C-alpha cells in the first residue's frame, strides 16, 4: 500500500494517539465510539470536566489530520497529499471483523482555500491501484461505489423533505436492514410520507458506469416526482450529479470498471459535503465495504481560511483478517531473513558471523 501511495505523491505522517474531546467530536454523532482517558487519581471525578476538555484516543485518522494541517499549515505545501497507516481505537462490540483496536490505512488530499474536483477522481483510483497490489495475496477485485451528497440532498429537498441528515442516516442502513425497514424509519423518524419514502428508495436503486446514463436515469426520476429543473433543489442536485458523472467517466477512461455510480451510498457521518465512497470486493458481499470516505469542506479551518479535503480509509486489520481466514493468504516464511548461515558447533560461530556480516554488507537497504 505504502509503495503505491508514495508513487502517487503522498507523504507519510504519524500523529499522536491522544486528541482533545473537542477535536474528536468534530465529526458529529461519534461520542459512543470514543475512549476517554483519565489518571487513576481522577477516577470517579471525571464528570467534573466537560467532555470537550478531556483527552481521548482517536477513533479515526481524519480528525487528527485536520488538527495536524491547522497546526502546521505554515510549513506544508498545498495541496497536501498524505498517507497514514496507524492504530485507532473505537468503542465497538468485539466480533468477527470488528475490533476495539485496529490499524487503518488512509490517504487524503487537503487544499488551502479550495480543492479542485479532479482529486475526487484521483483518490479512488489510487486506492484501487493499492488494493490491486493485494490481489497477489488472495484479495478479490475491488470496485469503488460513489455518490454525491449534493445530489442526494437536492433530490430529498425537491421531494419536500427537510431532515436531510436524518434521511441520509436511514438510507445508509439499506444494505443492513432492507428497503421495507428503511421505508418505515423514513416515515417514523424523518417525517416522510409513504410516497416520499418510496421516491428515496427509487433514487437508491440507481447505478451506472457511464455519466450520460446516470444523468438520464436521474432526470427521469426527478420528472416522475415533480422536481422541476429550474428549482433550487434541482440546481443543487445537478451540481452533485455533474461531479459524479465526471468521476465515473474519467475513472472509466483510466481504469475501466473500477468506479461506478451507486446512489444508495450515503455515509451516515454528517461532515461529508460532496463525493462519498464505499468499496466492495467481488464475491464478498457479506464483508460489506472495506474502504470508505468522501469529500469534506468544513472539517478544518483557521480563522477565515478553510482547508477542504477528500480522503479514503481502509480498515486494514479487518481486511487482513478476511485475507487470512477467507481468501487463503498465509505467511510464506517464518523469518524475514532470506539466508541462513549454519553454525555446526560453537567453534565455528566466529567464522559464521564473519560470513553473515559479509553477506549483509552486500545488501543496500
Predicted regions and their residues:
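Positively charged, Gly/Ser-enriched RNA/tRNA-binding surfaces
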Residues: 1-8, 19-22, 30, 50-52, ...
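Charged, often glycine-rich, active-site loop that binds/positions anionic groups
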Residues: 21-39
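Conserved phosphate-binding loops in nucleotide/dinucleotide-binding enzymes
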Residues: 37-41, 47-57, 301
Amino acid at each position: 500500500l505504502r509503495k503505491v501511495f508514495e508513487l502517487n505523491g503522498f507523504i507519510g505522517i504519524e500523529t499522536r494517539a491522544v486528541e482533545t474531546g473537542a477535536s474528536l467530536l468534530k465529526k458529529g454523532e461519534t461520542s459512543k465510539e470514543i475512549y476517554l482517558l483519565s489518571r487513576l487519581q481522577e477516577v470517579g471525578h471525571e464528570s467534573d470536566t466537560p467532555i470537550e476538555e478531556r483527552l481521548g484516543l482517536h477513533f479515526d485518522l481524519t480528525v487528527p489530520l485536520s488538527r495536524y494541517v491547522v497546526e502546521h499549515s505554515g510549513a506544508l505545501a498545498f495541496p497536501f497529499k498524505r498517507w497514514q497507516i496507524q492504530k485507532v481505537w473505537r468503542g465497538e462490540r468485539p466480533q468477527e471483523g470488528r475490533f476495539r483496536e485496529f490499524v487503518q490505512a488512509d490517504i487524503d488530499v487537503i487544499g488551502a482555500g479550495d480543492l479542485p474536483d479532479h482529486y475526487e477522481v484521483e483518490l479512488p483510483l489510487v486506492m484501487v491501484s493499492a488494493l490491486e497490489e493485494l490481489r497477489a495475496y488472495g484479495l478479490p477485485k475491488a470496485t469503488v461505489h460513489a455518490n454525491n451528497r449534493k445530489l442526494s440532498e437536492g433530490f430529498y429537498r425537491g421531494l419536500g423533505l427537510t431532515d436531510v441528515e436524518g434521511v441520509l442516516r436511514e438510507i445508509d442502513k439499506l444494505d443492513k436492514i432492507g428497503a421495507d425497514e428503511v421505508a418505515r424509519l423514513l416515515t417514523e423518524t424523518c417525517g416522510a410520507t409513504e410516497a416520499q419514502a418510496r421516491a428515496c428508495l427509487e433514487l437508491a436503486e440507481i447505478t451506472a458506469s457511464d455519466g450520460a446514463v446516470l444523468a438520464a436515469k436521474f432526470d427521469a426520476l426527478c420528472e416522475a416526482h415533480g422536481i422541476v429543473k429550474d428549482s433550487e433543489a434541482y440546481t443543487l442536485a445537478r451540481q452533485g450529479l455533474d461531479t459524479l458523472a465526471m468521476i465515473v467517466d474519467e475513472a472509466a477512461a483510466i481504469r475501466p470498471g473500477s468506479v461506478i455510480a451507486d446512489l444508495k451510498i450515503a455515509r451516515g457521518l454528517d461532515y461529508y459535503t460532496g463525493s462519498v465512497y464505499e468499496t466492495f470486493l467481488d464475491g464478498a458481499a457479506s464483508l460489506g465495504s472495506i474502504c470508505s470516505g468522501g469529500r469534506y469542506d468544513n472539517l478544518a479551518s483557521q480563522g477565515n481560511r478553510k482547508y477542504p479535503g477528500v480522503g479514503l480509509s481502509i480498515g486494514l486489520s479487518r481486511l487482513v483478517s478476511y485475507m487470512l481466514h477467507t481468501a487463503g493468504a498465509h505467511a510464506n516464511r517464518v523469518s524475514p531473513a532470506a539466508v541462513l548461515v549454519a553454525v555446526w558447533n560453537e567453534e565455528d560461530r566466529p567464522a559464521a558471523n564473519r560470513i553473515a556480516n559479509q553477506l549483509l554488507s552486500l545488501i543496500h537497504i
